[in-house]
Structures are given as structure tokens and as C-alpha cells.
Amino acid sequence: RLEQTDYMAYLVMDGGQCAGYFSYGAASHGGYKDFSFCLNSLYLLPPYQHMGLGRRIFAQVRQAARERKLDSFFCGCNVHNLPARRFYEKMGGVVGEIDDGHENLAEDQMYFEFCTGEQI
């Protein structure tokens, strides 16, 4: 990804400790519908969850999409990751498509669609 100019990746740090990571920009695992912008990953270690960090990160991603003059973006989520699904719903995500039923449950994905005009 170093050569890709529309892909941002961040480490979330707490002093010298890594608390998580997130990335956004061009979709890293293929496109979805006609969306050009994607929250590719968002992960916070359990001690850093439920502290408002995810909401702040999401606001940064939404702002980055706005700065690109986009009115929407998407993210993929494993169907079986209920905490992540609840988070994306709280952030205003609407389920667009679900691709489940795979033998390997890690391949079961759903796609959330977001508007950049919504405030969180």
C-alpha cells in the first residue's frame, strides 16, 4: 500500500502502547457498488473500547470523506461480529448487502453504507 496515495493507515497510541489501528480511503479488498471511499479497518483493543475512541475515529473518517466531496462511504463487517455491527449501526450505518453462508465463517460479510452529512 505504500504506493497508493488514497489510503490512510493509523496506529492509535496510548503513550508508548498501541491501542488499536484504523485505515480508510480506496477499498482495500475490492469495490462495493459504486462507492469510492471505504473505512477499511477499525480495531481497538478491549481496554480501549467504550471510551469514545471509536466515535472519534469514525468522525475523522467521515470528515475525510467530506473533504473529498463525497456524500457517502461504506465499510465491510463480519456478519458474526455483533459488537462491530452495533457500533456501525450507532454511527448511522445502513446495511446494504449481506454475503453469508460460507463454510468459513470469516468470509461472511455485510456492508454498511454511511452518509457524510450525518452527525455522530
Could you describe each region identified by the protein language model?
Residues R1-P46, F58-Q60, A64, G101, ...:
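Acetyl-CoA-dependent GNAT
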Residues K33-S36, M51-G52, A106:
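Non-catalytic, surface-exposed connector residues within folded enzymatic/regulatory domains
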Residues L45-A59, R68, V79-R86, K90:
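Conserved glycine-rich acetyl-CoA-binding loop
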Residues A65-G76:
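Conserved GNAT acetyl-CoA-binding A-motif
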Residues C75-R85, G101-E107:
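Conserved beta-strand-loop-alpha-helix junction that forms the acyl-donor binding cleft
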Residues E89-I98:
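Conserved acetyl-CoA-binding loop of GNAT-fold acetyltransferases
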Residues A106-I120:
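Terminal substrate-recognition subdomain of acyl/acetyltransferases
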